[in-house]
Design a protein with these regions (language model features):
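Acidic, metal/ion-coordinating pockets
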Residues: 32-282
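Bacterial N-terminal signal peptides
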Residues: 18-28
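Generic alpha-helical structural signal
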Residues: 8, 25-27, 35
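Short sequence/structural segments immediately N-terminal
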Residues: 34, 43-49, 168-170, 263-427
Length: 427
């Protein structure tokens, strides 16, 4: 008979016990497996934090990608949904952002996207047909009314509702986006598969939300943000029936948690969240396209330069020596350098608050109009042209209003006129 050492028997016993424990844990995991929900949305073109202030440096698609990737590695049954309203305000640069956002969403892979008013403003022709846009209260539109997902052995139906009040529809045509009604809910119920769990992506009024709540038909209702102030985030949507969870505005946070949870948790996308590497090429390409957009407008703007009303701070020095010295020692006199350091000295959305008269026949580029670089006298006092012709003609001054043109929202969350004004006060 072959003899085994005590240590050998001990090792076998340990492996046996570990095997039993692993089987038990695996069984427990299978029994308790359930969908892990992640919800985003309401980006409104804020593809990346501007970086103007550390305390408001939140959000961005690259940080979202990192967090989502980490959760996917931890939860095999992850269900990712997006509440839409992601596109920026219409503009030439906005179109570049739109393209980046949709390319990023392809990599982030949401199961469903609810198109919001911002998407509607650009027109359906701009919506990428390879993305899972969803609008359940639409008729005769090329988008599904319901998206089904099998997760953790459960069938989940994702429905989407956007109130017609937020969408432009030609008054001479029959409406193709319908308001909530008993007939609409009954139509949805007739399309539903028995035994399914149902989730509603919603953007509308509290009265409309109550209609859906009172139907008792949905397991969860998730609300797109109606809040415009990112410095005062509101994550609760009040209704007469019960409060609902509302996504943070401007993409600054995500909702996440198991589907059985009464309340999902908020994960804020703060400065300590790294950028997701797979999105880096998209942002590099976007920066190059924005630069080309900027350069393409220079020739046209140069032709208008002879009509400029701005003269630059150097023209003020002779008569306003002390004021000029005060300006030179302030951060305003180096405003453009803060953009140059991060490669944003060609980005129109940034330049408007870092130079004089951008897109107003003023600053063109640091090479063509260096005299109008940085925040100068004319940013606050207005054009000095008439004052130079007649020194007794003083430009109007509303210091507070001049400040809040740029020191606003997440760009300057700590702004307080009473503490900021003394830093640049001059006579």
């Amino acid at each position: 008979m072959k003899m085994h050492s005590v240590s050998s028997l001990s090792r076998r016993g340990t492996r046996f016990l570990l095997g039993l424990l692993g089987t038990f844990l695996l069984g427990a995991t299978l029994v308790h497996a359930e969908p892990y929900l992640v919800v985003s949305g309401d980006l409104r073109g804020e593809i990346k934090p501007c970086g103007c202030a550390e305390e408001s440096d939140m959000g961005g698609l690259q940080r979202r990608g990192t967090v989502l990737s980490n959760w996917r590695s931890e939860h095999s049954d992850l269900l990712y949904l997006d509440l839409g309203n992601n596109f920026p305000e219409p503009s030439a640069q906005g179109k570049l952002k739109l393209d980046l956002i949709q390319q990023a969403l392809k990599l982030l892979k949401p199961a469903a996207i609810l198109p919001g008013p911002h998407e509607w403003n650009y027109g359906q022709a701009t919506w990428d047909t390879s993305l899972p846009y969803l609008l359940s209260n639409a008729i005769d539109l090329p988008w599904p009314q319901v998206i089904s997902q099998n997760v953790s052995g459960e069938r989940w139906e994702i429905w989407g509702y956007v109130t017609p009040n937020l969408l432009y529809q030609n008054e001479n045509d029959l409406p193709n986006v319908l308001p909530v009604s008993n007939a609409l809910i009954q139509q949805w119920q007739s399309q539903s598969q028995p035994g399914s769990k149902r989730m509603l992506l919603f953007r509308g009024t509290s009265v409309e939300a109550d209609r859906f709540l009172q139907s008792g038909w949905f397991d969860r209702i998730l609300v797109g943000s109606s809040n415009d102030d990112e410095l005062n985030q509101v994550t609760t949507f009040a209704t007469a029936t019960q409060p609902l969870q509302m996504i943070p505005t401007k993409g600054q946070g995500l909702y996440h948690g198991f589907s059985s949870s009464d309340q999902l948790d908020v994960r804020w996308l703060r400065l300590d969240t790294a950028d997701w590497e797979p999105l880096t090429p998209l942002f590099t390409n976007y920066d190059q396209e924005v630069k080309q957009l900027f350069l393409s407008g220079l020739k046209r703007m140069q032709q208008l330069q002879q009509e400029t009303r701005f003269v630059g701070a150097a023209a003020c020095t002779t008569c306003h020596t002390q004021a000029h010295q005060s300006w030179e020692s302030s951060r305003h006199s180096h405003a453009l350098a803060t953009l140059t350091r991060v490669g944003k000295d060609f980005d129109p959305e940034c330049l408007q608050c870092h130079v004089v008269g951008f897109q107003k026949k003023g600053f063109l580029s640091n090479q063509l109009t260096p005299q109008l670089a940085n925040v100068q006298c004319e940013n606050c006092h207005g054009s000095a042209q008439e004052h130079l012709k007649n020194p007794l003609n003083h430009p109007p001054l509303d210091a507070r209003q001049a400040c809040v043109n740029c020191h606003v929202g997440s760009h300057s969350p700590s702004f307080d006129f009473s503490t900021y004004w003394p830093k640049i006060q001059h006579k």
